[in-house]
Curated annotation (Swiss-Prot):
Species this protein is from: Enterococcus faecalis (strain ATCC 700802 / V583)
Organism taxonomic ancestry: Bacteria, Bacillati, Bacillota, Bacilli, Lactobacillales
Function: Involved in the gluconeogenesis. Catalyzes stereospecifically the conversion of dihydroxyacetone phosphate (DHAP) to D-glyceraldehyde-3-phosphate (G3P).
Protein name: Triosephosphate isomerase
InterPro entries: Aldolase_TIM (IPR013785), TIM_sf (IPR035990), TrioseP_Isoase_bac/euk (IPR022896), Triosephosphate_isomerase (IPR000652), Triosephosphate_isomerase_AS (IPR020861)
GO MF, any single term: triose-phosphate isomerase activity
Length: 251
């Protein structure tokens, strides 16, 4: 039985005071980690104070990105070793916004995944297709390619422990969402690709999220599906009440 994981991706939103107010509102209200993993994907600026705010709570922290080197002349980048030292559990990598706006490649994302594991954290590895790819019927082929290139060189144990988030680009922040059956089908493609590469035991262990205009009103439909183990949520994770409602719908 795979434990559900609900991760909020705040993207480039909130001030420090807003982030800390959110943390105070949710830290004693989230369900137990025995039931569901509750994760906040915060801007890097807030990770240190939030780690302090949330140190005795069930909420886990995710960075939204990191570099693949621990130190060096990489102005403006965030060291995975430094992120881990703050007590961060997860790092989101491969998000479509990083791929599109910052030209990150599958090879870049693969190096980041290895660095994240090397520093004792867990990647939330994002994959997803454009509307053009979806309408051309090439979603499965596209997703298989992203996963195959993005996970190369990782061990069975590492892949089994990671989180893979399927986010159709055409559903991110648009108000549109892939219906639950489509989400289940493509999350099934993710799982079958992992099985081809790493075997059935690993594919049955890896947790797969759906992301793309998920909100409290529709999350239960997705979570009822066999291949959907959680959600990577953008806008609906920005308000404490909404984030808690997402978790309540899952527990």
């Amino acid at each position: 039985m795979r434990k559900p994981i609900i991760a909020g991706n705040w993207k480039m939103n909130k001030t420090l005071s807003e982030a800390q107010s959110f943390a105070e509102a949710v830290k004693n209200a989230v369900p137990s980690n025995d039931v569901v993993d509750a994760v906040i994907g915060s801007p890097a600026l807030f990770l240190a104070p939030l780690a302090w705010n949330l140190k005795d709570s069930e909420v886990k922290l995710a960075a939204q990105n990191c570099y693949w080197e621990n130190a060096g002349a990489f102005t403006g980048e965030n060291s995975p070793a430094a992120i881990a030292d703050l007590g961060v559990d997860y790092v989101i990598i491969g998000h479509s916004e990083r791929r599109e706006y910052f030209h990150e490649t599958d090879e870049d994302i693969n190096k980041k995944a290895k660095a994240i594991f090397a520093n004792g954290m867990t990647p939330i590895f994002c994959c997803g297709e454009t509307l053009e790819t979806y309408e051309a019927g090439k979603t499965a082929e596209w997703i298989e390619g992203q996963i195959t290139k993005g996970l190369v060189g990782l061990s069975n144990e590492q892949v089994a422990s990671m989180v893979i988030a399927y986010e159709p680009i055409w559903a991110i922040g648009t108000g549109k969402s892939a219906d639950a059956n489509i989400a289940d089908e493509i999350c099934g493609v993710v799982r079958s690709t992992v099985e081809k590469l790493y075997g059935k035991e690993v594919s049955e262990a890896v947790r797969i999220q759906y992301g793309g205009s998920v909100k409290p009103e529709n999350i239960a439909e997705y979570m009822a599906k066999e291949n959907v183990d959680g959600a990577l949520v953008g806008g609906a994770s920005l308000e404490a009440d909404s984030f808690l409602a997402l978790l309540d719908a899952v527990k």
